[in-house]
């Protein structure tokens, strides 16, 4: 008879399966009324040998959430922490603009004074710096007459300068 019981566990009869479903439905109804959070999940281990099957005691397994640290490191973090400088430039020729662009690429804010250069070269410099600032995701702002502040993406400028600075410029032209 024990041999028959072993195979009974392997093969489910339809009559018994229907009976088990009816029984499990009755058991589930009261369980649906209660809300219980379990942190343990039972894990059954089945050991099979040549002539018989036996079940070991269910072990409790703890559900753990592992916190993994990201392996990606931002290369610009070191530069941001080291350099918090504002570079001042007063270009005399257009070729000085490349030095300003290099400082912007190194994530440093630059203040550009264009008072000692002719208007045509000043416009070319501002056009070049506008493209540089756009490429690095930064910003360019007019601070005063012929003075501009160029900032990379890691620098925020708070506040605005009033529009009164434009009035004297219009009168001079």
From Swiss-Prot:
<protein>
    <recommendedName>
        <fullName>Cell division protein SepF</fullName>
    </recommendedName>
</protein>
<keyword id="KW-0132">Cell division</keyword>
<comment type="similarity">
    <text>Belongs to the SepF family.</text>
</comment>
<dbReference type="InterPro" id="IPR007561">
    <property type="entry name" value="Cell_div_SepF/SepF-rel"/>
</dbReference>
<keyword id="KW-0717">Septation</keyword>
<dbReference type="GO" id="GO:0043093">
    <property type="term" value="P:FtsZ-dependent cytokinesis"/>
</dbReference>
<comment type="function">
    <text>Cell division protein that is part of the divisome complex and is recruited early to the Z-ring. Probably stimulates Z-ring formation, perhaps through the cross-linking of FtsZ protofilaments. Its function overlaps with FtsA.</text>
</comment>
<dbReference type="GO" id="GO:0000917">
    <property type="term" value="P:division septum assembly"/>
</dbReference>
<dbReference type="InterPro" id="IPR038594">
    <property type="entry name" value="SepF-like_sf"/>
</dbReference>
<comment type="subunit">
    <text>Homodimer. Interacts with FtsZ.</text>
</comment>
<dbReference type="Pfam" id="PF04472">
    <property type="entry name" value="SepF"/>
</dbReference>
<dbReference type="InterPro" id="IPR023052">
    <property type="entry name" value="Cell_div_SepF"/>
</dbReference>
<keyword id="KW-0963">Cytoplasm</keyword>
<keyword id="KW-0131">Cell cycle</keyword>
<dbReference type="GO" id="GO:0005737">
    <property type="term" value="C:cytoplasm"/>
</dbReference>
